[in-house]
């Protein structure tokens, strides 16, 4: 599982054999996993006596200069654990492929890929989980974003990759579906999300324009309106009497960083920070 948010979104251990190997990419310790992993997942891990491993590929990618690209690290970790071919041989093949693919981009790029390959193979940590996981009923619980029957009965199972299990009877006889349901998805897949620095913002709105998921948007608030977040005076005569706010929907953001890249300010008006540090605050602001 390459994204920690998937543990509460999908049944990531479904179909795994007894004694199988499960690799998770997360920043969590065993103690943190007690409340970050859902009870059903912990049950499956313990009951099937899985060999459970963790790797913090996001941290490793930053350390070796790969930015937010974790694919090479995860692939190396896979070969280390899977033994489809000898791990040393797999690493040699991966390095040969990296050199062939990136040699024209310079030795530095090749070296960073080599470092990522080595890091993936050497930074795997085995998780010695307790036997109590087999029967525990405690763990992460996903809060429903809406009680809309169409979402809970139809869309939610599809988002969890269980659409094939839905009966035909649950569908509308005339084939109609409500619109605007993507607002309920709230995937929360970003590792880092942008936060707004009002002082540095020129109100150009380029960040909102470039966002591929429309999850960062400008808002105008009438002067005198009580709001729990930071604002600044809106620029332009036509906006006199209004305050300006650039607001993120943290759980809709994918963490691509396009908004930060496009910001023309010398001191960027947006800064990427870990999702978990702002999820609650920024989520409430968006709502």
Model segments located where?
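Ferredoxin-type iron-sulfur electron-transfer modules and their immediate structural context
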Residues: 90, 103-252, 260-287
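Active-site cofactor/cluster-binding pocket
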Residues: 1-157, 225-230, 282-287
